[in-house]
Structures are given as structure tokens and as C-alpha cells.
Amino acid sequence: MRKQEILIIESRSDQDIYDGRCEGDTLKRVLQLQGVSAKSIEVVNEKMFIKALNIAKRENIKYIHISAHGFDEGFTLTDGDIVTWRDFDRLAWPILRGKCICFSSCSVGNGVAELFTLHKSFCNAIVAPTRNISWGEGLVAYSAFYHRTQSHEKSSSQNVKVMNHIVGAGTFKLIESPFISRTYTIGAFMNNIF
């Protein structure tokens, strides 16, 4: 079994759970079709969120994908607790150092750069939406983003431009660390092309 390169952490609202809306498992299946190994974990509270973050310590995990309801100042867990950027720094520093974080959370791109004022090396880079996005927009845009990260010839800034071309100009933003802004190529070339 190949080592996981993407950790998907999802924290849905109670209404999302009731309605059967989720992103994590669907994105994991899309990634598997692309030859990328991912782990998807659903968390409902801060204790489970911390436990999931600790999985990111594995050196083969390069991308942390967080799917939760968000806003400029942070994001919300299933139990209703709000994780502000200061809280996230407290919970995730230095675990996410050297990783790339992708948020599928409404509007977090408008405030998440605060993490780099708390720690310049919090992570290598962040991709996040700057407006409210639908579940479908997030899934389609990130499916394209991760597909493109399989090529050494594509940069993260180019990949985010493609995401914006798909769902609308200015929707997603790449925020690079002032310390190290390296991103990663993932997966292996697919032998099973139909």
C-alpha cells in the first residue's frame, strides 16, 4: 500500500451530516482514481481535530486539506466551536511546518494569512477561497488542483489560476509563507489510462 500524501480533515455541520453532504470521502475517491493516496478523517470537536492534526506529522503527508464551514476569522467544528487563526496556531504549530494547507472553507482566504504573522514558518503555503463557495465548487476546484500537483512542470500559482478559471476569477488565493514557500508534486504517473 502506498503512503498517504494528502490528509483530508473534514468537520461538517450537524445539518450537513443529516442531509448527507460531505467532501472528504468523495475527494479521497477522486484522488485514488488519479493514483494519489489520501486519508480522510471526520472530526467533530477540538480533541478529535488535534488527534487528526497529529497524523500530519508523517513526513510523507505533504498536503493538509481542511473542509469545514469558514469565515474571515477562522472555521467552525461540528460541535459549533469556532477555531480562530490564533487557536489554529496554538493547535497546529509546529505540526504543519513544511506542509501545504488547502482550505475548502468559505472566505477563509480573507484572514488566514494571520497565521504567518504568528509564525512565519507555520506552513509552506495556503490555498483558500476568498468568498462563499458551494460544496460542488470546492470539490471540482480541488480535484483539478490536486490533479495538476502531479506534474513537476506546473506551479502552485498556475494551479490556483486554473481553479479560478473553473469556479470564477478571484475565488481561490495562494498565500505563500515568508519563510519557505515550497510546494510539492504528489502521486505517481497513472499506468491505467482508459
Say what each PLM segment does.
Residues 1-59:
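A domain-level signal for caspase-like cysteine endopeptidase catalytic cores
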Residues 1-2, 55-60, 93-97, 120-121:
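Flexible, charged surface loops at secondary-structure boundaries
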Residues 6, 38-39, 101, 124, ...:
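Hydrophobic anchor at the start of a short beta-strand
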Residues 13-17, 46-48, 70-74, 107-110, ...:
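Short acidic, S/G/P-rich loop/turn micro-motifs used as interaction or catalytic elements
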Residues 53-88:
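A glycine-rich, hydrophobic loop/mini-helix early in the fold
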Residues 80-139:
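Catalytic cores of nucleophile-dependent amide-cleaving enzymes
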Residues 82-92, 152-194:
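Caspase-like cysteine protease fold
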Residues 139-150:
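Short, small-residue alpha-helix embedded
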